[in-house]
Amino acid sequence: AAEHLHGSGASAVFIARGIYGNPWVFGDARALAFDGTPVPSRSSVERLEALREHLTLTHELLPLMSRARTYASWYLKGMPHAAAWRAQVVRCSTYEEFMALVDDIERDVVVCEAALAAGEPVPAHPLEA
């Protein structure tokens, strides 16, 4: 993206849907475009922390949590067992249910990523074990 911005002479970049599940995208784009700083990849735990904050802010502004299902799906993209967790997300209807589920997801992600780092297979999804 930085090469295209500098090479084309454009003065702006349209980020669009890149923001979904990636609240860092504006800071990352700025750092890359102006400083050439490489964009760091965020860990799954960092993404889940951002999801918690997003859910909390949503709940404070609009206690009806139906939109939160969409937000949660964005943040789960690419995580171990993401499809199984998204199936659980659609069953959540309260803030408390969402937060408890995010805690469960984090525990699972930590175990899965540790297994991958050790060269071991990813354990089965907790609800399938």
Regions found by a protein language model. Name each.
Residues 1-129:
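Alpha/beta catalytic cores of nucleotide-metabolism and tRNA/nucleoside-modifying enzymes
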